[in-house]
């Protein structure tokens, strides 16, 4: 996470006072300040020899409190591309490579002199001065799962007790809600047919920090764990519903953290703030038109191409949600790579570029970071079916907002697009 999403800064002394020893995981903070080792660059916290699994919450809270600050609240929108998008056909075209590698698409200039991306992404190209393309993401495994994008760890990696938490769960636990009427972490993605696309969990952070999943198009259909709003006519009915819910959950051994969950749910269900944020029909028609109309049909065994969810994500962070996650389409194109790209990329281009523009227009670009990526890249060589196969050695990402310095490309691959040649960046970063 970059650009101050975690908003944590510690000095050497603060690290020692908080009892933080041994370093593995870095959570980046604001662009001013010092490293724990005294070097002036990004502020960050390095936590525990076993990552965050070795650090108790009181220590984290003490460390965060000691950092002081009064910093501006940050949010993040993460757009997950299930299946693994083809980096060679998006942000890292290889026009000097052999034909079976370079493919059909041509590069086009962007709003940043000297930076080119695929002709299939003309609207993102016009937003490149507000974006950063990372061409050297590493650390993936050959496994179709959202786990590495949501936690930084492969699904099959060694886990601490409880499992690795999603970054949204970590932020929920460490920072809590900005507003009691809004959950800190909202997942807009549908439950996907390929189960590992849904694999990420709150892990050792606990079930109270699981993403809130609104269902339906807006407040009329909003449910919370099967509790229909229409049945909750008064607070007594609400409490009775939660009592039954607690008994059901207790039978499954998940009571730990339910008090916090109930408090959050009570605030959500007794306020109209969340329902109003989900109801984008009240948005300016020109803004709705900018995002465009999506397609609710499920692609492959993954997600639909719903452009409206990008608008809803913006509305949610504006209303006070810290983390919003979205899944878009299905990118596992072992065949007909270019036919699929011509169907999906124009919609992807419109939705992502509209989000970047909208955040800028509303003055949210310094406080809301956007991260777009999938679980791995694709093979340099196009196969006999006109597709690209799995390639975990390197992949790509697109960043925007978050107060980060944009208008640049980070990292590079070799001449065939198969290996990270410059500035490899791990998913955990």
Where are these regions (language model features)?
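Ligand-binding pockets and gating/stacking loops
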Residues: 5-9, 13-15, 19-429
């Amino acid at each position: 996470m970059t650009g101050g999403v975690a908003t944590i800064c510690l000095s050497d002394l603060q690290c020692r006072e908080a009892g933080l020893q041994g370093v593995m995981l870095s959570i980046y903070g604001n662009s001013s300040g010092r490293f724990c080792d005294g070097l002036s660059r990004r502020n960050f916290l390095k936590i525990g020899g076993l990552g965050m699994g070795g650090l108790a919450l009181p220590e984290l809270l003490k460390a965060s409190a000691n950092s002081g600050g009064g910093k501006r609240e940050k949010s993040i929108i993460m757009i997950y591309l299930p299946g693994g998008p083809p980096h060679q056909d998006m942000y890292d075209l290889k026009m000097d490579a052999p034909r079976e590698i370079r493919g059909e698409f041509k590069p086009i200039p962007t709003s940043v002199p000297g930076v080119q991306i695929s002709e299939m992404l003309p609207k993102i190209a016009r937003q490149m001065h507000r974006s950063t393309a990372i061409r050297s993401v590493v650390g993936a495994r050959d496994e179709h799962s959202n786990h590495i994008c949501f936690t930084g760890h492969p699904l099959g990696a060694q886990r601490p007790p409880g499992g690795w938490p999603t970054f949204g769960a970590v932020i929920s636990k460490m920072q809590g809600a900005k507003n009691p009427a809004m959950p800190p972490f909202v997942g807009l993605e549908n439950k996907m047919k390929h189960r590992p696309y849904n694999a990420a969990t709150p892990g050792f952070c606990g079930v109270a920090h699981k993403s809130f999943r609104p269902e339906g198009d807006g407040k009329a259909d909003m449910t919370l764990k099967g509790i229909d709003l229409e049945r909750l006519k008064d607070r007594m009915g609400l409490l009775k519903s939660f009592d039954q819910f607690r008994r059901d959950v207790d039978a499954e051994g998940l009571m730990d953290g339910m008090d916090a969950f109930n408090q959050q749910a009570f605030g959500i269900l007794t306020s109209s703030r969340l329902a109003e944020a989900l109801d984008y029909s009240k948005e300016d028609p020109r803004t709705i038109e900018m995002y465009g109309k999506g397609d609710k049909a499920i692609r492959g065994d993954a997600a639909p191409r719903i452009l409206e969810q990008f608008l809803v994500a913006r509305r949610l962070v504006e209303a006070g949600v810290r983390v919003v996650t979205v899944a878009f389409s299905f990118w596992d194109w072992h065949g007909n790579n270019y036919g699929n790209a011509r169907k999906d990329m124009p919609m992807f281009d419109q939705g992502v570029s509209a989000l970047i523009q909208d955040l800028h227009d509303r003055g949210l670009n310094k406080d809301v970071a956007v991260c777009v990526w999938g679980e791995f890249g694709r093979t340099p060589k196009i196969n006999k079916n006109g597709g690209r196969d799995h390639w975990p050695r390197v992949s790509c990402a697109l960043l925007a907002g978050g107060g980060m310095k944009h208008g640049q490309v980070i990292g590079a691959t070799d001449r065939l697009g198969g290996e990270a040649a410059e500035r490899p960046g791990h998913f955990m970063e």
